[in-house]
């Protein structure tokens, strides 16, 4: 290499990873004005970094989903993303839960049933005379149950705000008889003492 020549490098300073939670070299004035409004809870404006860092820098227990990941059977297999029309699998130990906004329907106009691995929510208004005409509303929504959920255990409740909350506990994992990973024998250095 001749004097004055630099080796080729793909390193661009503008493409370095940047930690959004580190202190900025230039102080931000964005949150300095309160515009006569009440401050955020826990005075978020003065210590947003201390508030955000523990919440957003911990490891995520599942796979992260990005809007850029293509949807389809191959994407689901490659990226661990559920295919379209499927509800995301619950975290271990937590119940499966889905909320459906049904605020324009009365409880007697709603029906929830499980069929062929799906929860089917349907609602129907009878024809009503309203401003300028007759109105009839109906809808049907099908939500696929995860494999970890037993369809018999699905139950639904309606909140005062008009949200239909559909829940089901997860089926605990099991192993067939004889394929257990647990050792049924007591350890040799037991803490038990024989009394005479």
Swiss-Prot record:
Phosphoserine PTM positions: 24, 57, 87
Modification after translation: Phosphorylated.
Pfam families reported for this sequence: HSP20
InterPro entries hit by this protein: A-crystallin/Hsp20_dom (IPR002068), Alpha-crystallin/sHSP_animal (IPR001436), HSP20-like_chaperone (IPR008978), HSPB8 (IPR043254), HspB8_ACD (IPR042790)
Residue ranges of domain sHSP in the record: 74-185
Subcellular location(s) of the protein: Cytoplasm; Nucleus
Segments of this protein annotated with the region Disordered: 1-35, 176-196
Keyword Transmembrane helix attached: no
Leader peptide range in chain numbering: none
Gene Ontology cellular component annotations, sorted alphabetically: cytoplasm; nucleus; protein folding chaperone complex
Phosphothreonine: modified positions: 63
Entry's family note: Belongs to the small heat shock protein (HSP20) family.
Asymmetric dimethylarginine, modified sites: 71, 78
Biological role stated in the UniProt entry: Involved in the chaperone-assisted selective autophagy (CASA), a crucial process for protein quality control, particularly in mechanical strained cells and tissues such as muscle. Displays temperature-dependent chaperone activity.
Highest taxon above the source species: Eukaryota
Coiled coil location: none
Record key words, sorted: Chaperone, Cytoplasm, Methylation, Nucleus, Phosphoprotein, Stress response
Gene behind the chain: HSPB8
Entry protein name: Heat shock protein beta-8
One GO-annotated biological process of the protein: cellular response to unfolded protein
Oligomeric form and interacting partners: Monomer. Forms a ternary complex with BAG3 and HSPA1A. Component of the chaperone-assisted selective autophagy (CASA) complex consisting of BAG3, HSPA8/HSC70, HSPB8 and STUB1/CHIP. Interacts with HSPB1. Interacts with DNAJB6. Interacts with BAG3.
């Amino acid at each position: 290499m001749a004097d004055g020549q630099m080796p080729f490098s793909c390193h661009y300073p503008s493409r370095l990873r940047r930690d959004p939670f580190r202190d900025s070299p230039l102080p931000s004035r964005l949150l300095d004005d309160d515009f006569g409004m009440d401050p955020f809870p826990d005075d978020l404006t003065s210590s947003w970094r201390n508030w955000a860092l523990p919440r957003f820098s911990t490891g995520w227990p599942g796979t992260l989903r990005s809007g850029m990941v293509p949807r389809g059977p191959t994407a689901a297999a490659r990226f661990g993303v559920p295919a379209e029309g499927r509800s995301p699998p619950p975290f271990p130990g937590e119940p499966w839960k889905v909320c459906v906004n049904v605020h324009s329907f009365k409880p007697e106009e709603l029906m929830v049933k499980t069929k062929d691995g799906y929860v089917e929510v349907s609602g129907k208004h009878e024809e009503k005379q309203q401003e300028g005409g007759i109105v009839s509303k109906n809808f049907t929504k099908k939500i696929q149950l995860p494999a970890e959920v037993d369809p018999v255990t699905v139950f639904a409740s309606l909140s005062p705000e008009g949200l239909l909350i559909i829940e089901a506990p997860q089926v605990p994992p099991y192993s067939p008889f004889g394929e257990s990973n647990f050792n049924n024998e007591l350890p040799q250095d037991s803490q038990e003492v024989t009394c005479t």
